[in-house]
């Protein structure tokens, strides 16, 4: 996204049309002039660097020790230390608040509610996560999400799928605002499911909303054009951070560097082994929202040390050296990765991540155009089998299988449709590729056939979905291909979980009263911003 005002860019482009033949920049490989209608109109647009999106902080990447920096007191052995490198990226300054999520719910209900209320229902957090069998938490069930007293508190009860849907919505709303701000798009506050703005649909030429004006083109055959990815105007997608990104950002080791040396490693997002502020002005104050000990969630009346019985406002306590709040306590946070115990050992040492399912846009079989869902929301039945032993003698007397079904929202009207890459589609060229041969690599090295005891069974083993052989849900493990990692401590956790290297996991359809999320965004181009060396 260019930092130049787009109106200035439009004026420069219009002037270039008149002065194209006078001193235009030329290609270093062909010698032809850029931005010249007489040469076909190939454009080189003015560009400085990526604009920082709303709510984001630039996290300058680098190398660090990914995994355990504290004793493995739970003996999970699931975070073996390993040196990796994380590219620069952006991350939300705070956790997503109740008020921000209510903005999303309001928009979803306004756009889809009249025709497709199920889309709105799917976005609703589970407020019943507050209930406990032997505690009176009904006030949180009734008031926490919607009462203005909690508007600046982190949203909870959101599952992994809902967090991803929020990221997709946020991407479209931010890019829509950019086009309106620059005078290219009509502001239509009454958009419906047929004409709301979608970044992917717009770039695919399938969006049917109201444009205010187009960009001038140097192509004599088409004097005006839509915004393209090559213009650098649109921001990259908001998304969940990867586990490595989250952990890297949480430590904030940029504050402990002298030259290229990291002087001190950290157990928490701050220096030292304690959880109290050593600064003379704030000495003794708790640095994060967590449980200090048995039954002590907030301190003593008259001196509430952490000033929070459950969650705390997203802008509270002290930020780490990247300027990020609550990277230790308050609520744990979803990350993008699928859980496996040995991911830190198996994943690549550059931008490690487990969870790849490679996809491509669906296209019309006749003309190859990108397909957009212009019909109704598409729900996909989500199934896995739970095996329960039969009998009480402890012997192997068979199993009873229950089919557990749930539906996930995979497509809504107005969005580009996607599919997994497949050998069945010659255009995917999987038989010619060297870096991947299929779509699903969630179980690579840990859960696929090659890493299982069924490897010697040959072709029969491949009839089972990846991850279902080694990890048989509820029979031998709670780990499967839809168990995702969440990081950090929370208002319900002891100090051990505030170490960024610790990790836990949960089914992507489940949620907790102490689990929230924050968004991230890819940094394109230089890993440092303007003004940095």
Residue ranges of each PLM-predicted region?
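C-terminal motif of bacterial Sec signal peptides marking the signal peptidase cleavage site
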Residues: 19-21
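Short, P/G- and charge-enriched loop/turn segments at secondary-structure junctions
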Residues: 44-46, 76-79, 473, 503-508
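Short Gly/Pro-enriched turn/cap motifs at secondary-structure boundaries
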Residues: 47, 80-81, 303-304, 313-315, ...
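Short, structured beta-strand segments at or near domain termini in extracellular proteins/domains
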Residues: 512-531
């Amino acid at each position: 996204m260019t930092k130049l005002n787009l109106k200035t860019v439009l004026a420069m482009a219009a002037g270039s049309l008149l002065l194209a033949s006078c001193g235009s920049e030329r290609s270093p490989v062909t010698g032809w002039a850029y931005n010249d209608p007489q040469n076909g109109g190939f454009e080189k647009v003015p560009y400085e660097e990526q604009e920082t999106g709303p709510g984001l902080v630039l996290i300058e990447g680098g190398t660090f020790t990914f995994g355990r920096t504290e004793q493995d007191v739970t003996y999970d052995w699931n975070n073996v230390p390993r040196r990796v490198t994380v590219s620069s990226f952006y991350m939300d300054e705070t956790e997503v608040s109740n008020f921000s999520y209510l903005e999303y719910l309001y928009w979803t209900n306004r756009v889809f509610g009249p025709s497709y209320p199920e889309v709105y229902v799917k976005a609703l957090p589970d407020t019943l996560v507050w209930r406990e069998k032997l505690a009176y938490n009904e006030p949180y069930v009734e008031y926490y999400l919607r009462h203005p007293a909690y508007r600046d508190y982190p949203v909870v009860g959101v599952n992994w799928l809902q967090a991803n849907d929020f990221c997709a919505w946020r991407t479209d709303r931010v890019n829509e605002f950019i086009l309106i701000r620059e005078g290219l798009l009509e502001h239509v506050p009454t958009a419906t499911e047929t004409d709301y703005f979608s970044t992917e649909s717009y770039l695919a030429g399938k969006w049917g909303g109201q444009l205010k004006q187009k960009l001038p083109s140097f192509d004599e055959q088409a004097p005006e054009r839509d915004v393209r990815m090559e213009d650098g105007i649109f921001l990259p997608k908001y998304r969940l951070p990867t586990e490595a990104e989250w952990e890297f950002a949480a430590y904030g080791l940029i504050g402990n560097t002298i030259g290229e040396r990291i002087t001190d490693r950290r157990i928490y997002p701050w220096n030292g082994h304690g959880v109290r502020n050593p600064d003379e002005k704030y000495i003794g104050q708790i640095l994060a929202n967590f449980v200090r000990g048995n039954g002590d969630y907030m301190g003593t009346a008259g001196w509430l040390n952490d000033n929070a019985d459950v969650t705390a406002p997203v802008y509270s306590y002290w930020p780490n050296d990247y300027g990020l709040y609550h990277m230790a306590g308050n609520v744990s946070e979803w990350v993008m990765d699928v859980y496996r115990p040995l991911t830190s050992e198996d994943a690549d040492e550059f931008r490690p991540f487990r969870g790849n399912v490679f996809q491509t846009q669906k296209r019309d079989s006749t003309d190859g155009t990108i397909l957009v869902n212009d019909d109704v929301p598409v729900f996909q039945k989500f199934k896995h089998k739970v095996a329960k032993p039969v009998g009480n003698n402890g012997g192997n007397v068979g199993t009873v299988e229950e089919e557990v079904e749930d539906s996930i929202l995979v497509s809504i009207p107005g969005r580009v449709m996607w599919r997994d890459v497949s050998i069945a589609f010659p255009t995917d060229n999987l038989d010619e590729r060297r870096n991947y041969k299929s779509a699903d690599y969630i179980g690579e090295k840990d859960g696929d056939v090659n890493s299982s005891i069924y490897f010697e069974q040959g072709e029969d083993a491949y009839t089972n979905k990846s991850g279902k052989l080694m990890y048989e849900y509820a029979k031998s493990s709670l780990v499967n291909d839809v168990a995702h990692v969440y990081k950090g401590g929370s208002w319900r956790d002891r100090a051990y979980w505030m170490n960024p290297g610790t990790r836990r996991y949960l089914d992507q359809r489940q949620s907790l009263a102490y689990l929230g999320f924050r968004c991230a965004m890819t940094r394109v181009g230089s890993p440092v911003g303007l003004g940095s060396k």
